[in-house]
Design a protein with these regions (language model features):
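Structural signature of hydrophobic alpha-helical transmembrane segments
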Residues: 5-18, 66-78
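N-terminal signal-anchor/start-transfer transmembrane helix
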Residues: 14-30, 81
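Juxtamembrane boundary at the C-terminal end of a transmembrane helix
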Residues: 115-129
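Membrane-helix boundary connector in multi-pass membrane proteins
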Residues: 63-64, 83-104
Length: 129
C-alpha cells in the first residue's frame, strides 16, 4: 500500500475504529469512571495509537508477512492504550478496577480488529485488495 492510500484510509479507519471501540469502553470500563471519561477514552486512546498502526507500522513491515504486521499492530495498540489509560486514570478505585479497565481496552481492540478483518475480506474502501 502506498503512503497516499494510508493517509486516505486514516480518517475513515479512525472513525470506524472509534465507532466500534467507544461503545465497548462505555459499557465495560469500570463504572468508577464517569460517562464523559469513558467516551473520551474511546476517542483519545484511538487517536494516540491509530496513526502508529496505520501510518508507521505498515512501511516498517512492508517486506514482512501480513501476519507479522498484524501481530505487531494488534499487540502495540492495546498495550499502549492500557498504559496510556493507566497513566491518565489508573490507581483510582483499586486493582479490580484497573484489571477491568485493561480487559475493556483489550476487548475493544479485539472487537475492532475482528470487525476490520470482516470489512477487509469484502474489500472495504478498496485498500485491501
Amino acid at each position: 500500500m502506498v503512503t497516499e492510500d494510508l493517509w486516505r484510509f486514516l480518517p475513515l479507519g479512525y472513525l470506524f475504529t472509534v465507532a466500534v471501540e467507544t461503545p465497548v469502553l462505555v459499557l465495560f470500563l469500570s463504572q468508577h469512571h464517569a460517562l464523559k471519561r469513558r467516551i473520551f477514552a474511546g476517542l483519545w486512546l484511538t487517536a494516540c495509537t491509530y496513526p502508529v498502526v496505520v501510518l508507521v507500522l505498515p512501511p516498517l513491515f512492508a517486506d514482512s508477512s501480513r501476519a507479522l504486521y498484524l501481530a505487531a499492530a494488534e499487540t502495540f495498540a492495546p498495550a499502549a492504550e492500557c498504559l496510556l489509560f493507566y497513566l491518565a486514570f489508573g490507581g483510582e478505585g483499586g486493582d479490580g478496577v484497573t484489571r477491568r479497565d485493561f480487559a475493556a481496552v483489550v476487548g475493544a481492540n479485539l472487537l475492532s480488529f475482528l470487525a476490520g478483518e470482516v470489512l477487509a475480506a469484502y474489500g472495504w474502501f478498496g485498500l485491501f485488495r
